[in-house]
Amino acid sequence: MDLQTQLQELKTSTQAKLAEMRGEHSKELQELRVAVLGKKGSLTELLKGLKDLPSEERPTVGKMVNEVRDVLTEAFDEAAKVVEAAKIQAQLDSESLDVTLPGRQVNLGNRHILSQIAEEIEDIFLGMGFQIVDGFEVETDYYNFERMNLPKDHPARDMQDTFYITEEILLRTHTSPVQARTLDKHDFSKGPLKMISPGRVFRRDTDDATHSHQFHQIEGLVVGKNISMGDLKGTLEMIIQKMFGAERRIRLRPSYFPFTEPSVEVDVSCFKCGGKGCNVCKNTGWIEILGAGMVHPQVLEMSGVDSEEYSGFAFGLGQERIAMLRYGINDIRGFYQGDVRFSEQFK
């Protein structure tokens, strides 16, 4: 039998065997591939016969060998796909799924308590006609300090209190720069400016139960004609009562902030004793909660606002402070440690 006939028979017989392969024949398929195309396989043995052919026949037979090899290689690849698909289908047919079984329980997360507090406060202010304005966490010395009427020698500008990146660039110590930038652009012909600016702020504090090198503030600003201290008090009373209950009262104590004049500390009647005196309020009946005041005329003038025609008030409160008072939390570090046992209490 000549070599060409043997090649044709090898191709035909191999294709016939491949056509019979099923899902359970994956092992047999691999064995057949090795027997036909392997280093010691049938095709390799036939190739050895090329050297015995006359020189004029070798190119034709050699070409036929390559064609047979290509055809069989492709046939084996296709058979492997068929066998694998049949194997998978057999597995699917043999297994059943009980659709009445309960699904796996998914552990859902929840909003962080600080996010909840921020959203609650923002919703209150939106209902009062305020706008919410975000700003840069990396600020210039000019907007963070000078525009807030903080002179160069003010203690708050000391390196111990502020994270400086360069001599003129720093991590903001409050969200007041957002107010200054907004005040610069506001068109008072369209009405007064009413805004809050929430966000993270940074101080060079040593972390302990009541201090953190970063925390969250929400600062508010209202500027318009005939804005008075009475407007400030009424606004703060509404906020405190919505946050802590309608029975809460506030009081204003004189204080000092460079960017407000006059300035006040705002206290709220104790949540625990109702103002009678207890360990929470240190027997005073009051708890300090935020700082506020009338916008300093110089701050208005630096934004090009006529302080003779316009006035305003500003205030700032901390989200952590609100949460700690509302829920009786004693350690501010709990907000940042990612302990699920802590955070899941506030679902």
Curated annotation (Swiss-Prot):
This protein's GO CC annotations: cytoplasm
InterPro entries: aa-tRNA-synth_II, aa-tRNA-synth_II/BPL/LPL, Phe-tRNA-synth_IIc_asu, Phe-tRNA_ligase_II_N, Phe_tRNA_ligase_alpha1_bac, Phenylalanyl-tRNA_Synthase, tRNA-bd_arm
Pfam families membership: Phe_tRNA-synt_N, tRNA-synt_2d
Catalyzed chemical reaction(s): tRNA(Phe) + L-phenylalanine + ATP = L-phenylalanyl-tRNA(Phe) + AMP + diphosphate + H(+)
Residue intervals passing through the bilayer: none
Predominant cellular place of this UniProt entry's protein: cytoplasm
Residues given in the record as Mg(2+) binding sites: 261
Compartments it resides in: Cytoplasm
EC id: 6.1.1.20
Molecular function in Gene Ontology: ATP binding; catalytic activity, acting on a protein; magnesium ion binding; phenylalanine-tRNA ligase activity; transferase activity; tRNA binding
Gene Ontology terms: biological process: phenylalanyl-tRNA aminoacylation
Co-factor remark: Binds 2 magnesium ions per tetramer.
Top EC group: ligase
Keywords: Aminoacyl-tRNA synthetase, ATP-binding, Cytoplasm, Ligase, Magnesium, Metal-binding, Nucleotide-binding, Protein biosynthesis
Lineage top rank: taxon: Bacteria
Cofactor(s) of this protein: Mg(2+)
PANTHER family assigned: PHENYLALANINE--TRNA LIGASE, MITOCHONDRIAL (PTHR11538:SF41), PHENYLALANYL-TRNA SYNTHETASE (PTHR11538)
NCBIfam families xrefs: pheS (TIGR00468)
Complex and partners: Tetramer of two alpha and two beta subunits.
Family membership: Belongs to the class-II aminoacyl-tRNA synthetase family. Phe-tRNA synthetase alpha subunit type 1 subfamily.
Protein's name in the database: Phenylalanine--tRNA ligase alpha subunit
Organism from which the protein derives: Streptococcus thermophilus (strain ATCC BAA-491 / LMD-9)
